[in-house]
């Protein structure tokens, strides 16, 4: 349940960031977004932090939720011991794949290269930035203090199970 909450939180940030970029630039091709971090810095910083959260880099909540999944897998009993390592290996592979498709967007956004002309600043409106910022801060804060979320979810899960 923790991973579902974490995943939805950071995916919301990423979708909001993508929506803001599409709305302000009209661009949907990643190659056309070189230098977008200079044009839309707040949006792209949120997108970058959301990307780190989805990959599972500390101090984002994604790290904590993946850590908990890995520990749960390693603590399993009643199965062949090599199967306990299957969960952490899959988590690591998925993190590498996620980094492979998100980090090029972030890196090209902030480091477009010398030959790219960066246009004027065109940051999203406050009605788009505020929710994105709140969720971004929440993902980092809950990553640093995960007990705030686990203490909230534990009674709910106990009642359901």
Please name every model-derived segment:
Residues 9-14, 157-161:
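Alpha-helical transmembrane segments and their membrane-interface exit regions
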Residues 1, 66-75, 154-161:
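Membrane-interface interhelical loops and short amphipathic "cap" helices
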Residues 12-77, 81-95, 120-138:
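Interfacial and helix-entry/exit segments of alpha-helical transmembrane bundles
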Residues 37-44, 95, 99-161:
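Cytoplasmic/organellar membrane-interface segments at the starts of transmembrane helices
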Residues 7, 33, 62, 106, ...:
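Divalent metal-coordination and catalytic microenvironments
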Residues 1-8:
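Short alpha-helical catalytic segment bearing the HExxH-like zincin motif
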